[in-house]
Regions:
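Hydrophobic alpha-helical and helix-loop surface patches within well-folded domains
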Residues: 173, 199-418
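Acidic/His-enriched low-complexity segments
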Residues: 1-244, 266, 271, 370-373, ...
Length: 418
């Protein structure tokens, strides 16, 4: 694909009245001469589409293929150099916990409420906007959200500008660093939050109304662990802010969207009066796991999903390492051997097991490899490797790897070379 310098400038307008959203996208990129562009696209209706090239508007024909989840855009003549692909479309604010979806909950007064949130990993950004929805096709993003005045809008970056737009408010966010589509985040809801700072990095834990008093532990852990990861990796956290969001309806335990990590409410909220130490430990481990991803996965991303273990094994291993440093009394490495190793070995003994590096051809196969082999067996292998090469050499190797491949993609063999 002769495409480079990709930027998505997208405005989203979620409509809770009929659970749909409107999208306006300007996709800018540099291309070698071509008259056909194929994007990933699913469950989206295209209203308008054209190309801007050298200050001229070029008409196009477009075709959606639901089975291939693709949008083919064809112009009569070839275009090259810097061009803009302009698309106006509508989508579904679904209730399937993927793509751009609605999360239903009850507020303290017993009233039913909705928020809009996203889950794009592994291949569901295409349900929110037409894009090249693959981890290796990194881009920058300029996001804006048009929302009702009683709502607050969130994305990966801080708000650059906020202004009235008719009866609504438009939130414009700063441009993201170069990153994969699956790490983009959009959130619209009636949030409240607690906040702190690490140097000039704003850290917040956001909850639905009536729950922020249960967010203090998570805030404290996030600040502690983030600083420790910076020290260990030798690379500062690169974004100006970090939000941790408690989502009522959430399929995964948590998701490491860069600068806007989402969690199940039960995993992020802690009530010291009623919650156990076991709950506190679980919250600490999940927060640590997601923070590890801000480097392993977000800063350096696997080229394709066969190397998912590069994300998940490291996050599993590092999560235990960092939490153990602050809470040695929990004996986390003993628990790791008992839980992670036994789970992984039991699964690995079955005929249906697979290598850590597993072949993936189609997005539908990706979800199947988010299992104990990718997470726990990989984590155990890394623990064994660290023990073999020594802590210091292991750390040096990781620092070298992260520095070499920051803001780009890597494969398993790139790590071994480091």
């Amino acid at each position: 694909m002769g495409i480079s310098e990709i930027n998505y400038d997208i405005q989203f307008e979620p409509l809770f009245s009929n659970f749909t959203f409107k999208g306006m996208e300007i996709l800018s990129f540099k291309t070698t001469p071509s008259n056909k562009f194929v994007l990933n696209c699913a469950e989206i209706k295209i209203k308008k589409c054209y190309i801007l090239s050298k200050n001229k508007t070029i008409d196009v024909n477009f075709k959606l293929d639901a089975k291939k989840e693709s949008l083919s855009i064809v112009s009569k003549s070839k275009v090259s150099g810097k061009i803009k692909l302009c698309i106006e479309y509508t989508g579904i604010l679904n209730d399937r916990l993927l793509g751009f979806y609605r999360s239903k909950y009850t507020d303290p007064s017993g009233k039913t409420k909705y928020m809009a949130t996203t889950q794009f990993e592994a291949a569901d950004a295409r349900r929110a906007f037409p894009c090249w929805d693959e981890p290796a096709t990194k881009a920058t993003f300029d996001v804006s959200l048009l929302v009702e005045k009683n709502y607050m809008a969130m994305s990966n970056m801080p708000v650059r500008k906020k202004q009235n737009f008719g009866s609504k408010i438009i939130y414009e966010f700063e441009r993201t660093p170069i990153m994969s589509t699956y790490l983009l985040y959009l959130g619209v809801g009636e949030f409240e939050y607690v906040e702190t700072k690490l140097r000039n990095i704003q850290i917040r834990v956001l909850t639905t109304k009536g729950n922020k008093n249960k967010a203090k532990l998570s805030l404290e852990l996030t600040k502690k662990f983030l600083g420790e990861y910076e020290k260990y990796f030798g690379i500062k956290y690169p974004l100006p802010k970090l939000d941790m969001l408690a989502i009522p309806d959430f399929a995964a335990g948590a998701m490491e969207n860069w600068g806007a990590i989402t969690f199940r409410e039960t995993i992020l909220l802690y009530d010291p009066k009623t919650s156990s130490t076991k709950t506190k430990q679980f919250i600490a481990e999940v927060i640590s796991h997601e923070l590890a991803h801000q480097w392993f996965g977000n800063l350096v991303t696997m080229k394709w999903w066969n190397d998912l273990w590069l994300n998940e094994s490291f996050a599993t291993f590092m999560a235990t390492k960092i939490v153990d440093k602050f809470y040695p009394e929990w004996d986390l490495w003993d628990q790791f051997l008992e839980d992670a190793m036994n789970t992984a070995m039991s699964l690995d003994a079955l005929k249906t097991s697979h290598p850590i590096d597993v072949k993936v051809n189609h997005p539908s196969e990706i979800r199947e490899i988010f299992d104990s082999i990718s997470y726990d067996k990989g984590g155990c292998v890394l623990r064994m490797l660290e023990n073999f090469v020594t802590d210091k050499n292991f750390q040096k190797g990781l620092q070298k790897y992260l520095k070499k491949y920051e803001y780009s993609n890597a494969e398993g063999r790139d790590l071994w070379k480091s």
